[in-house]
């Protein structure tokens, strides 16, 4: 029966009930009260008179009597039952989550009690968010935290598309929160922060200074303000030499050409760069051990001329891995050497920029102090452009140098740092490929190094670490999804959340008339379903975030923004880069 026919029949039956029931109610009332069930007193045309009398229908709707109330109930039940039958489809289907049944999967979201137990007991760890919506961040607030001394490591991978509040709801709150954790403890934590656009420094520097932090800045935005750092000066072994060289080459912003598309060229350039850095370290005085001197050396006749190159390193008594790398370079034919030289010279052309020479010529800060006990903890901001990867190679070299130095410091202190060090690597794709990061992540916890790796998407990570991206993710016990735009990240997120079991219940109603003339038949079936489908991951509300952790069910929390644009919500006044001292111009 179609809806139109059913409606017509419904109206007809309702009209008949509204005619017949008032007459029946009136007859019953009269028989009871007036005629007292004596048929001899009933007029011959009593039924017709009752039917035609308007007072019959007026009394039905205005008088409260048992017979009227009974008839009203009949009409009401008819309306409810008829509407229920018409609005319900012939085949009703719905599904229920049945992870407790678990025939096809047991994944589910954490219950409110589990969330409280897992994230709200302690505040000594990364700040994650809240179980309450629409909150504004303030230091020390009640919220969800990844416990510092819990069973999971503190290595966290964060993914958020542009506009997903990565900075305001995650990075900024944690810069404020980390000093708060150690406020009343003997030890203090050091901070290493990569800062696109100088936003993080501007919004947090005064707060950090108020917490007795020594705030340092490496300015790769203007190449003008703050500190300078020469990564070559901190190289103390062959392994570090090669890590610096490999990181620099792999992170080059130069577009791939016919040669660099082949890994042979990048490896050859890395070997040559490592050899030249080793030469500078062994032969030049300390003040000349710089990247700009490496560039000068590369373009000198001693390197360019094939005959002079054969004896160049031996004439200066260069030894160790530097000599071996140089000999590897000499094995190539002259034409191949020329291409290697051109490729490396193109990548080192950065060091013809005066500002970059100034910022890498000397070191006004000592990264050997990071992780050690000292009077003031250190917060280092590495400012970098968010729309230009020109300086990615040298930024990569600096981050690589800092990580290597942290491991050396930990080794000198018995295996772990005296002061825990937090790495907040915002826009990590702009740093490039950090050598051996997948191996370091496996040992950072024991060294008391706690990294936060922030990406816009999984394809960014895969692009930078094509062979190791899954290793990097597996070393991070916590994955956060703040917002997803691309299919690859959505599919990965959906897959990592796991499968659950759903029950689909089908109800078949036979509705050939206005009232079902047969009892409903039901069937139940169990199926597998992703806890969240990829499209559902992409439709995550702007205010929400997904937490996926090893050994725990996933959960969805609310983001908590630091609303610095509202003066009443500011934790500190903004700082300005121009207030920092300018870097002296190199001679």
List PLM regions with ranges.
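Short alpha-helix boundary/capping motifs
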Residues: 1, 372-373, 472-473, 521-522, ...
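Basic- and hydrophobic-enriched, low-structure N-terminal and domain-boundary segments
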Residues: 1-173, 181-187, 510, 522, ...
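P-loop NTPase motor domains
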Residues: 22-26, 33, 147-449, 464, ...
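General secondary-structure edge motif
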Residues: 107, 138, 142, 150, ...
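A short glycine-/small-residue-rich loop at the edge of a beta-strand within enzyme catalytic domains
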Residues: 113-122, 393, 428, 484
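N-terminal short leaders/motifs
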Residues: 131-146, 322-336, 502-506
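Low-complexity, polar-biased intrinsically disordered regions enriched in Pro/Ser/Thr/Gly
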Residues: 135-142, 253-264, 504-525
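Conserved ATP-driven motor cores of ASCE-family P-loop NTPases powering translocation/secretion/packaging/pilus
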Residues: 441-546
């Amino acid at each position: 029966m179609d809806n139109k026919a059913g409606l017509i029949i419904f109206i007809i039956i309702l009209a008949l009930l509204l005619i017949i029931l008032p007459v029946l109610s009136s007859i019953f009332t009269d028989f009871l009260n007036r005629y007292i069930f004596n048929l001899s007193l009933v007029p011959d045309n009593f039924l017709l008179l009752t039917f035609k009398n308007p007072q019959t229908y007026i009394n039905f709707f205005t008088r409260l009597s048992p017979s009227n109330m009974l008839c009203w109930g009949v009409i009401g039940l008819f309306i409810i039952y008829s509407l229920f039958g018409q609005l319900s489809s012939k085949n009703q289907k719905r599904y229920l989550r049945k992870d407790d049944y678990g025939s096809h999967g047991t994944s589910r979201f954490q219950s409110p009690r589990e969330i409280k137990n897992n994230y709200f007991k302690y505040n000594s760890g990364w700040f994650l968010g809240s179980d309450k919506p629409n909150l504004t961040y303030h230091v020390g607030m009640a919220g969800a935290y990844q416990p510092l001394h819990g069973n999971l490591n503190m290595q966290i991978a964060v993914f958020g598309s542009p506009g997903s509040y990565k900075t305001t709801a995650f990075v900024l709150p944690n810069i404020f929160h980390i000093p708060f954790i150690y406020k009343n403890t003997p030890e203090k934590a050091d901070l290493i922060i990569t800062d696109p656009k100088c936003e993080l420094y501007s919004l947090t520097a005064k707060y950090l200074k108020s917490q007795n932090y020594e705030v340092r800045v490496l300015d790769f935005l203007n190449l003008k303000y703050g500190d300078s750092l020469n990564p070559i000066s901190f190289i103390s072994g062959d392994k570090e030499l090669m890590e610096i060289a490999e990181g620099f080459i792999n992170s080059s912003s130069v577009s791939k050409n016919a040669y660099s598309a082949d890994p042979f060229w990048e490896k050859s350039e890395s070997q040559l760069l490592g050899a030249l850095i080793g030469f500078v370290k062994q032969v030049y005085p300390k003040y000349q051990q710089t990247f700009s001197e490496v560039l000068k050396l590369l373009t000198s006749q001693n390197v360019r001329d094939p005959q002079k190159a054969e004896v160049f390193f031996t004439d200066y008594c260069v030894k160790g891995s530097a000599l071996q790398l140089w000999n590897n370079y000499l094995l190539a034919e002259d034409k191949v050497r020329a291409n290697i030289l051109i490729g490396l010279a193109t990548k080192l052309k950065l060091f013809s920029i005066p500002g970059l020479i100034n910022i890498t010529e000397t070191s006004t800060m000592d990264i050997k102090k990071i992780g050690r006990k000292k009077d003031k903890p250190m917060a280092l901001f590495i400012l970098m452009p968010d729309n230009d990867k020109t300086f990615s190679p040298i930024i990569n070299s600096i981050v690589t140098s800092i990580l290597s130095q942290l491991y050396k410091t930990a080794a000198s202190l018995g295996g772990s740092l005296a002061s825990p060090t937090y790495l907040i690597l915002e826009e990590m794709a702009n740093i490039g490929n950090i050598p051996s990061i997948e191996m370091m992540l496996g040992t950072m916890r024991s060294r008391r190094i706690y990294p936060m790796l922030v990406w816009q998407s999984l394809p960014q990570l895969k692009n930078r670490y094509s062979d190791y991206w899954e290793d990097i993710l597996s070393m991070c016990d916590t994955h956060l999804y703040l917002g997803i735009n691309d299919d690859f990240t959505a599919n990965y997120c959906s897959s990592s959340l796991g499968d659950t079991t759903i029950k689909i219940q089908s109800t078949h109603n036979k509705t050939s008339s206005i009232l079902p003339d047969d009892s409903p038949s039901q069937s139940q079936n169990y199926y597998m379903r992703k806890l969240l489908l990829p499209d559902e991951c992409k439709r995550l509300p702007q205010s929400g975030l997904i937490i996926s952790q090893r050994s725990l069910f996933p959960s969805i929390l609310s983001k908590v923004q630091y609303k610095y644009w509202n003066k009443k919500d500011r934790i500190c006044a903004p700082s300005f880069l121009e207030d920092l001292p300018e870097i002296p111009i190199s001679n």
